[in-house]
Amino acid sequence: MNRKSIAKGKLVRRFGVNIFEQPKYDKLLKKKTNPPGMHGRSRRTKVTEYGKQLIEKQKVKFTYGVSERQLTNVFKEARRQHGVTGDNLLALLERRIDNIVYRAGFAISRAHARQIVSHGIIILNGRRVTIPSITLRANDIIQVKEKDSFKKLVRSNIEKTSTLRKLPDWIEVNADALNVKIIRTPSRDEIPTLANEQMIVEYYSKRA
């Protein structure tokens, strides 16, 4: 994925919501209420319906750290599934292995979680994996590779995130054994992603 270097603080201010779910960005939004480059109301312009849809798509793209191609493919899969396409879209993104590593507190951020997976630190159902985009299913189990340095890193991350992040009910985390079991697919109200998924569906539907 070709990621342009965009400061996370600027992205948070651009969208007006803390898409990275980290306390420091809540403080930033309280301190700087205007998007970057805007100083007062005089420069605000009316956003078109397409513009609103694009903003919602970008929120999700940067929240989960996926490329345009990856997000398009996730939408196509979500549309093939039964149920509400928008809910399916977010549930698929939530069940990415890098996001599970993040939600479990094994990593400080999703970017850090991608590194952990890419470096082969995570074992999925007994096999080492290095692809952050793998989608997990119910009863899948991930665990930290048997190496002291890896375990020390993850235990440190769990300690740092334990007071900042609520563990989802749809995963079962064993902090002692350093493993996570997927219980089920999350429902929409269990996904804290701050985006209007219906607008994302409308965006892609017009381009299908």
Curated annotation (Swiss-Prot):
Fetch the SMART domains from UniProt: Ribosomal_S4, S4
Q: Taking every annotated instance into account, which residue ranges of this chain make up the domain S4 RNA-binding? A: 95-159
> PROSITE patterns recorded for this chain?
RIBOSOMAL_S4 (PS00632), S4 (PS50889)
GO biological-process terms attached to the record: ribosomal small subunit biogenesis; translation
Gene3D superfamilies recorded for this chain? Ribosomal Protein S4 Delta 41, Chain A, domain 1, RNA-binding S4 domain
GO CC, sorted alphabetically, is: small ribosomal subunit
This protein's source sits in the domain of life called: Bacteria
In the record, what terms sit under GO molecular function?
rRNA binding; structural constituent of ribosome
Which keywords has UniProt assigned to this entry?
Answer: Ribonucleoprotein, Ribosomal protein, RNA-binding, rRNA-binding
Q: Please explain the role this protein plays, according to its UniProt record.
A: One of the primary rRNA binding proteins, it binds directly to 16S rRNA where it nucleates assembly of the body of the 30S subunit. With S5 and S12 plays an important role in translational accuracy.
Instruction: Tell me the protein family, please.
Output: Belongs to the universal ribosomal protein uS4 family.
- What does the record note on quaternary structure? Part of the 30S ribosomal subunit. Contacts protein S5. The interaction surface between S4 and S5 is involved in control of translational fidelity.
Task: Write down what this protein is called.
Answer: Small ribosomal subunit protein uS4
